[in-house]
Regions:
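Extracytoplasmic ligand-binding site segments that recognize negatively charged/polar headgroups
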Residues: 134
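N-terminal organellar transit peptides
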Residues: 2-104, 109-113, 123-127, 138-303
């Protein structure tokens, strides 16, 4: 009886294999995920459009690849000037959860945060003319005092806490507050350097030499150890297949989910939309004012 059961199981496996082959079900795939645009937490902008790279997008695409047993390796097509520090860090955390080989393919530009999210991939491929690097941080805080005066707006400010109003943009920073801002920026810079050092197996001292904020071409980046190979997407796909020990894999290009108009409205929030509608009479200056008041805190970015 046991012998018969074993034979039945073998026959069933052979039949399933034949069915999967005849139906064209791939057993070995390389998934290609396109990541294009600035790095930020939300979806594409309502008024200015354009794609963005968000943690939510990266998470959903990587989860799909992780759950597909036929996907043996992943290629990330990165085209980004960088963006929000926190979003870059969250995306890198998502990438580090993947146990399958990951190869990054750089396009025209993969700078600052675009490089940050790629630094811990198994391999990085860049075109000779790719612009990459730009390892550094920029923190911006607008001073709205002149704009308020132009618009005829006077503000009464009440605070509790020595530096509570330093982020309001209503006055110049004191020397002490400028030191606070610089220390925060330096700390984020150190975090960037640590990620690159770990991901590229370089000493922190070496990375600091490279981390001047300048851009490098793909050729320069390879010479400096910031990328592994020169080539395009096909080079990255072949390299990913090689890392996964797969010959002639099927390449599956993941389509980017386009957020609906409704989801974009929900992401922005009803109150913010209402503010935008009300501020249109103020023109460009009003929009700048709205954006600053809606989030008056510093905007440190890897860009």
């Amino acid at each position: 009886m046991r012998k018969v059961t074993v034979i039945i199981c073998i026959v069933a496996l052979l039949v399933l294999g034949a069915v999967s082959t005849s139906c064209g079900i791939a057993e070995n795939k390389v998934a290609v995920i396109s990541l294009s645009g600035p790095v930020q937490s939300g979806s594409s902008g309502l008024f200015f459009g354009g794609s963005v790279i968000s943690p939510k997008l990266v998470r959903s695409q990587l989860e799909r690849a992780k759950k597909d047993f036929a996907v043996k390796a992943i290629v990330l097509q990165v085209e980004s000037p960088g963006g929000s520090v926190a979003s870059c860090q969250e995306i890198l955390n998502e990438i580090e959860t993947v146990e399958k080989p990951i190869v990054v393919s750089f396009g025209d530009i993969a700078a600052s945060g675009g490089y940050y999210i790629s630094a811990k991939a198994d391999k990085i491929v860049a075109l000779p003319g790719t612009l990459t690097g730009s390892i550094g941080v920029i923190s911006e805080m607008p001073n709205l005092k002149g704009l308020f005066e132009k618009l005829g707006i006077e503000m009464e400010v009440f605070t509790a806490g020595k530096h509570k109003d330093m982020y309001a943009g209503l006055r110049e920073l004191t020397p002490e507050e400028k030191v606070i801002m610089q220390e925060m920026t330096d700390q984020l810079y150190d975090q960037f350097i640590q990620v690159v050092a770990e991901g590229r197996s370089l000493s922190e001292a070496k990375v600091r030499e490279l981390a001047t904020g300048q851009l490098y071409t793909g050729v320069q980046a390879k010479e400096l150890g910031l990328v592994d190979d020169l080539g395009g997407l096909n080079t990255a796909i072949d390299l990913a297949a090689s890392l996964a020990n797969v010959k002639k894999p099927e390449v599956e290009y993941y389509k980017r989910e386009t957020p609906s108009l409704l989801s974009t409205f929900l992401d922005m929030g009803v109150q913010k939309l209402n503010n935008i509608i009300q501020v249109q009479s103020l023109g460009a200056e009003g929009i700048i004012l709205l954006e600053t008041l809606s989030n008056p805190y510093p905007q440190p970015e890897y860009r």
